[in-house]
């Protein structure tokens, strides 16, 4: 007799595979968040890059979005912020520039072209942001080489690794879109935020202390974080 798999089993398998694939991508993301970038003094890095010193700053926000990778200067240190910025820029340009507006109205083919443009802009922004981050590390005396040919070579490698990390994260998000449960970028952002949950609780506690002590800074910072978070979710 021919044996057939019951429909409910087939349906269950079809539903569970995307979930397992998404979890696998999240594991890869967390592994990349601990891979150290070369040519950095890890001992100096731990003493200088202290997230507790970044409270109420944009650095704290970036560290949260990267799942703590920013403070450790790892492969995914820049997180997915270059892609988010690129998406925002392209969406605004689609309204302001007629050729891009027409492209956005061309259906699936137009969306693929806009997605390709967004990727290129992401790499460009990644290089810019990686360069800025490198100089931050250089000024913090975290880099191993600070003069001569070694300085230039290590600078290029570090910047390219940071940029490559952003490109890999963008690719991981697209894999979740294609083979996982969808919303890949949002899921990676969520995974990073969950990894930083203890730090977030600590930051919220500091905000609360500011409010209890009568500081008006609390009433500015909390809405700012909410607006930034909602903007990211809406764009992605």
Task: For every predicted segment, state its role.
Residues 1-102, 109-236:
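N-terminal cationic and glycine-rich segments that engage phosphates or anionic surfaces
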């Amino acid at each position: 007799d021919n044996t057939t798999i019951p429909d409910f089993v087939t349906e269950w398998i079809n539903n569970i595979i995307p979930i397992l694939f998404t979890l696998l991508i999240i594991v890869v993301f967390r592994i990349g968040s601990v891979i150290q970038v070369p040519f950095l003094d890890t001992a100096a890095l731990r003493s200088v890059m202290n997230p507790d010193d970044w409270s109420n700053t944009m650095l704290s926000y970036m560290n949260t979005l990267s799942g703590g990778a920013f403070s450790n200067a790892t492969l995914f240190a820049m997180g997915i912020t270059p892609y988010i910025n690129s998406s925002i820029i392209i969406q605004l340009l689609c309204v302001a520039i007629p050729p891009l507006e027409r492209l956005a109205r061309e259906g699936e083919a137009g969306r693929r072209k806009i997605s390709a443009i967004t990727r290129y802009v992401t790499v460009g922004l990644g290089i810019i942001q990686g360069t800025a981050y490198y100089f931050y590390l250089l000024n913090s005396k975290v880099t191993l080489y600070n003069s001569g040919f070694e300085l230039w070579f290590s600078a290029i490698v570090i910047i390219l690794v940071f940029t490559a990390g952003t490109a890999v994260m963008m690719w991981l998000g697209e894999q979740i879109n294609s083979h996982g449960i969808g919303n890949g970028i949002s899921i990676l952002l969520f995974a990073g935020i969950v990894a930083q949950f203890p730090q977030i609780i600590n930051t919220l506690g500091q905000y609360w202390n500011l409010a209890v002590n009568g500081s008006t800074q609390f009433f500015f910072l909390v809405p700012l974080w909410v607006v930034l978070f909602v903007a990211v979710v809406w764009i992605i």
